[in-house]
């Protein structure tokens, strides 16, 4: 029997079978040992084969080949990865310029990982109703930056419903992963898109100005127009997994494009003479914040923070 994984609690998986049943499944112990160094070898969005037992329980015994997935280093700094979701048509990264602030380094790490696994990303700038004039100017500068690179952007207020209809329309016929820091209003936005869903929402810690986790597992929801949303727990950081140093620049489209003009083919864009990328940064043709994010990821590689895939 085949089906789609629509929920993952860490201990069991809910599968919607091709004939419309909803079945809770486990994975067999030996399935975990098939060379998959991941905290969750089965992810929401996976197409799977399941076997029903006489006792009424079910096991996942096979995962179909994935079209793509979004992966990050496991938060416990082990040699394992964590797969956020699989078989995606797009991601929507929900970000805020304050309450809490989403750093450009976090945004760029997420974008680079999505580029590596060929998942299109759109940026959703939430809480536009809460910002002062300086924050709104900064917001517009970020939108100008990322739109120019090629990432579509939305301005929304999930709380007031502003801009939500444009996102709804963009979800039609697609499987979309929603991700972002805790506290950016991701769950509030999903509730605005799907009023009957009642995804749990949380408050902001006033001491740290950071969000508190409300979603504790990944889950898929149906949306109008034959689409699906995958809601994931809020993430604090985005440790990139299985990237070689020389590949990192490939996942920054504007850096990769300019790097063709570097004097040396193996230029790291840090100190080499004749570096077209550094020249473009100095001329403000490449954003300094994006270049900083690129260097930050190179530093991770040097410090051994990247993990090899197994």
Swiss-Prot record:
It comes from the Bacteria. It is an enzyme of class 3 (hydrolase). Its cofactor is Zn(2+). It holds the Pfam family RsgA_N. The keyword Iron does not apply. GTP binds at residues 126-129, 180-188. The keyword rRNA-binding applies. Transmembrane segments: none annotated. One of its GO terms (cellular component) is cytoplasm. It is found in: Cytoplasm. SUPFAM superfamilies: Nucleic acid-binding proteins (SSF50249), P-loop containing nucleoside triphosphate hydrolases (SSF52540). Zn(2+) binds at residues 262, 267, 269, 275. Its EC number is 3.6.1.-. This is Small ribosomal subunit biogenesis GTPase RsgA 2. It comes from Bacteroides thetaiotaomicron (strain ATCC 29148 / DSM 2079 / JCM 5827 / CCUG 10774 / NCTC 10582 / VPI-5482 / E50). The lineage of its organism: Bacteria, Pseudomonadati, Bacteroidota, Bacteroidia, Bacteroidales.
């Amino acid at each position: 029997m085949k089906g789609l994984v629509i929920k993952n609690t860490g201990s069991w998986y809910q599968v919607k079978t091709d004939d419309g049943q909803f079945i809770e499944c486990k994975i067999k112990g030996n399935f975990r040992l098939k060379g998959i160094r991941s905290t969750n070898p089965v992810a929401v969005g996976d197409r799977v084969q399941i076997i029903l037992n006489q006792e009424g329980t079910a096991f996942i015994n096979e995962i179909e080949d994935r079209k793509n997935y979004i992966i990050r280093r496991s938060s416990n700094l082990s040699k394992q990865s964590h797969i956020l979701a699989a078989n995606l048509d797009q991601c929507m990264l929900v970000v805020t310029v304050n309450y809490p602030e989403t750093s450009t380094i976090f945004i760029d790490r997420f974008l680079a990982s999505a580029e590596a696994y060929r998942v299109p990303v759109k940026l959703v700038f939430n809480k536009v109703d809460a910002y002062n004039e300086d924050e709104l100017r900064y917001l517009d500068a970020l939108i100008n930056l990322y739109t120019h690179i090629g990432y579509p952007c939305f301005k929304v207020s999930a709380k007031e419903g502003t801009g939500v209809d444009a996102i709804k329309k963009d979800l039609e016929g697609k499987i979309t992963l929603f991700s972002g820091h805790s506290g950016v209003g991701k769950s509030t936005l999903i509730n605005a898109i799907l009023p009957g869903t009642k995804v749990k929402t949380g408050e902001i810690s006033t001491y740290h100005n950071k969000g508190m986790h409300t979603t504790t597992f990944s889950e898929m929801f149906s949306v109008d127009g034959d689409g699906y949303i995958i809601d994931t727990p809020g993430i604090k950081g985005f440790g990139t997994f299985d990237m070689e140093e020389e590949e990192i620049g490939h996942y920054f489209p504007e850096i990769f494009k300019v790097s063709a003009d570097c004097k040396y083919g193996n230029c790291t864009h840090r100190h080499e003479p004749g570096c077209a990328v550094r020249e473009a940064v100095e001329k403000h043709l490449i954003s300094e914040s994006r270049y900083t994010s690129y260097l930050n990821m190179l530093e991770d590689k040097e410090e051994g923070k990247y993990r090899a895939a197994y």
